[in-house]
């Protein structure tokens, strides 16, 4: 995917700088875990996941109905970010980890956790401003772990009044869930509208189990 990159210059990432970046339509990344430099990314084609168009396959619906995993919100933000960074190649370096942890303490960054017998086995985290949620990364230590986290998050965002789920890019995994690419101009128009309204991720309780998620399936209304 074509995108423009802007090298970061001092000062280092701060919560305020992150918020201003998101509101301007850009986001930070690092080349690798051990590379302390950060650059800003502005994709020409932006990935979004329409909250009224999330695709949940019949197979995944059956899994949601029978699994005994549990869900939680903001119980282990650092653990979720660490899980997302725990891979051979990652764009999450120490500077990014610290900045998002600080943003979480301010109430702007959030994580949804998936647990099996109390152990963290999947999750997703991102930033919420207005009615926009900027998805940063997700991880899975069990098959379907990240899918369950994503479906749960999308359902929760919609119930809480969010209108824009920014996935930044569209991976094959996200495409199967309904993510699409839109132009930079279209994205920024949607972003402006989302930033002009308000929503609260804690306005509604998060379902405790995947079986309680109101997730649409093929041929079913997305209500």
From Swiss-Prot:
Gene3D superfamilies documented for this protein: Leucyl/phenylalanyl-tRNA-protein transferase, C-terminal domain
InterPro entries per record: Acyl_CoA_acyltransferase, Leu/Phe-tRNA_Trfase, Leu/Phe-tRNA_Trfase_C
Biological processes annotated in GO: protein catabolic process
Major subcellular site: cytoplasm
Domain of life: Bacteria
Keyword Cell inner membrane tagged: no
GO molecular function, one term: leucyl-tRNA--protein transferase activity
EC number of the protein: 2.3.2.6
Protein name: Leucyl/phenylalanyl-tRNA--protein transferase
Species this chain originates from: Dinoroseobacter shibae (strain DSM 16493 / NCIMB 14021 / DFL 12)
Lineage of source species: Bacteria, Pseudomonadati, Pseudomonadota, Alphaproteobacteria, Rhodobacterales
Gene name per UniProt: aat
